[in-house]
Amino acid sequence: MKAAVCRRYGPPSVITIEDRPEPLPGRGEVLIAIESAGLTSADARIRAARAPAGFAPFIRLAFGLTGPRRPVLGREYAGRVVALGDGVSRFRLGDEVFGITDGMRLGAHAERVAVRADGLIRTRPDGMIVPEAAAFFFGGLTAADFLLDQCKLQPGERLLVVGATGAVGSAAVQIAHHQGAHVTALASKANLELARKLGSDEALDYRLDAAIGAFDVILDVPGVLPNALARLAPGGRLGLVTASLGQLLGAMIRPRRDSDRRISANVIKETPEAMARLIALYTAGAYRPLLAESFSLAEIVRAHAAADSGHKVGNVTIRMPKIQ
């Protein structure tokens, strides 16, 4: 099978297309012929061994010292079940599925991937197109976890989303709008109209630093908003999606020191329940993954460059060769 392989950390050009053995599904696993895969900011960070301040050593400890131990990156996928391991009854051959690879196994940037049948895999809902399915979970699960679980966003509260048209921010604007919050979006000038279409009540150019007033919740996706705590109303909550080690430690300490304003920077929950909630939001018309550029597997170096640009709108997806 063809796969995108990362054998050493570095710029997008370190990714090569190679022929690799097709995986065999073990007991309790299914083999997926991938039609499309998401290429997320997390994939780009792993490829470059790039992390928020203070976390760089941990990336190499977790994934490999000089290059990823599992050289085929990618976690989000959409495809079709083409083989069943022993003991699998939940799926049948030909089922159209989407999901997230198991734990740190990665492997979705390839024509085939084997995953646990009882893991983070679901049958694709009627009407959901393949690119949506491939880009469904990364931004959506992150946004829902921060807004609904960590920051406890309530109807009528004022929310500021920093980075409102990326994968996470675009999902957050939609989910918060559905939740009945008043949403202010910070984005580039070129993306203000898009932010409004996603459901924001106000859309402001982040370069002007015009987000004034007291917000009940701030979701800072890139972790760059100056004086964020000072912009919170009493009892306000700050969600830091991309947090430095110092910010994470602060989030752990501050609730004990200051019950008035809180910082949340916890790892999100990837559970069947979280997936089901996001699918329910999709079914209710409250969430659609924002699709950006789509690249063929052969163009994956360009896809990584797009993810690295810092100006990515929505989700980048990878198209696989036609399923045989």
Feature names for model-found ranges:
Residues 286-290, 304-324:
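C-terminal capping/lid region of NAD(P)-dependent oxidoreductase domains
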Residues 210-217:
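A short acidic, Gly/Pro-enriched loop at the edge of an enzyme's catalytic core
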Residues 21-38, 52-103:
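Glycine-rich beta-strand-centered segment in the early N-terminal region that forms part
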Residues 64-67, 72-78, 90, 99-163:
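NAD(P)H dinucleotide-binding glycine-rich loop of Rossmann-like/cofactor-binding domains
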Residues 133-205:
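Mid-domain Rossmann-like dinucleotide-binding core that forms the NAD(H)/NADP(H) cofactor-binding site
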Residues 96, 158, 236-237:
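Short glycine-centered segments of the SAM/dcSAM-binding site in methyltransferase folds
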Residues 224-287, 320-324:
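Glycine-rich phosphate-binding loop and adjacent beta-alpha segment
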Residues 85-87, 183-194, 222-226, 245-247:
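Short glycine/proline-centered loop/turn elements that form peptide/ligand docking sites
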